[in-house]
Every structure is written in C-alpha cells, then in structure tokens.
C-alpha cells in the first residue's frame, strides 16, 4: 500500500474523531525518516490545540488503527499542532487566515515564477490574491496551487 493511500485512509478515520472533539484535522502524513516510519496527524482549533487535545485523539486513533490493522509496517504515531507554518489546505483556511503572511508554490510558473510570498488579501472563485511587496497584487488560480502555508511574521 502506498504512503499516500495509508495517509488517505487514516484521514478518513481521524477526521470524524477530531470533529467530535471540536478539532480540525489539518493534515495526515505517512513518511519514512532515518529508516523509521511515522504517521503524523496535525490538528488545530481556534485559539490553538493543547496537549490534552493531542493525547485524546492519539489514544482513540491508536485504538481504531489497531482494530483495523491495515498498515503493513510498524510506525510511530505522532499527533500535534501544525505549527506556525501551518499548511493551507481548504478554501476555508484562506478565509480564516486573511491578512496573514503566506508562502504559495505553483505547479507551473506564473509571470515567470513558481514561489510567491506575501500577505493574503482574499480568495474567491478565481483563486487566491496576495500582496507582494508594497503595491503588487497577484491572483493565483486554485488549480495552480501546489503548496501553501502560513509564513512566520517577525
């Protein structure tokens, strides 16, 4: 089973579990690092999550994963916050984080570049609009966004 298939299946299990606890499932990753496999589940909620939130989801998800036992390898389950550079995955994320600094990568160059950093000004049917520098606005179509995340403000 491919890593993306495992992550997708875990996401299907974890999303309703998180939602029952008032949490948002941001992302699930199944990766190999240094010869060890990690199943990473990133959660959030307005105001941020705490250790109790992570522990509660970790316990329930661990039991559910043991019950279905579809992951063919041993792994370490990690449940945590997405951190300061949280990925932007859903249209709602772009509404929630309007006004924040973001970094967006595109599949193909737009106006000669594939990496954009700026302030998130809004989103709509056509895509995401960010302010680059002082006065330049760029609208990035939804289907061109390969990766987007919040950027740390100093």
From Swiss-Prot:
CDD domains: YlxS_C. The lineage of its organism: Bacteria, Bacillati, Bacillota, Clostridia, Thermoanaerobacterales. Belongs to the RimP family. SUPFAM superfamilies: YhbC-like, C-terminal domain, YhbC-like, N-terminal domain. Pfam families: DUF150_C, RimP_N. This is Ribosome maturation factor RimP. GO terms for cellular component: cytosol. The keyword Glycosyltransferase does not apply. Its main location: cytoplasm. GO terms for biological process: ribosomal small subunit assembly; translation. Required for maturation of 30S ribosomal subunits. It is found in: Cytoplasm. The keyword Nucleus does not apply. It comes from Desulforudis audaxviator (strain MP104C). HAMAP family: RimP (MF_01077). Gene3D superfamilies: Ribosome maturation factor RimP, C-terminal domain, RimP-like superfamily, N-terminal. InterPro entries: Ribosome_maturation_RimP, RimP_C, RimP_C_sf, RimP_N, RimP_N_sf.
């Amino acid at each position: 089973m491919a890593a993306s298939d495992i992550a997708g299946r875990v996401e299907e299990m974890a999303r309703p579990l998180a939602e029952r606890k008032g949490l948002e499932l941001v992302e699930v990753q199944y990766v190999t690092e240094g010869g060890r496999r990690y199943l990473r589940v990133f959660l959030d909620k307005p105001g941020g999550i705490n250790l109790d939130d992570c522990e509660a989801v970790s316990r329930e998800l661990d039991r559910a994963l043991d019950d279905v036992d579809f992951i063919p390898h041993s792994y370490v389950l990690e449940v945590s916050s997405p951190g300061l550079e949280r990925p932007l995955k859903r249209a709602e994320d772009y509404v929630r984080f309007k006004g924040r600094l973001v970094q967006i990568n595109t599949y193909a160059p737009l106006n000669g570049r594939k990496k954009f950093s700026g302030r998130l000004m809004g989103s709509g049917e056509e895509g995401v609009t960010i302010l680059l520098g002082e006065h330049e606005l760029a609208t990035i179509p939804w289907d061109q966004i390969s990766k987007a995340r919040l950027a740390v403000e100093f």
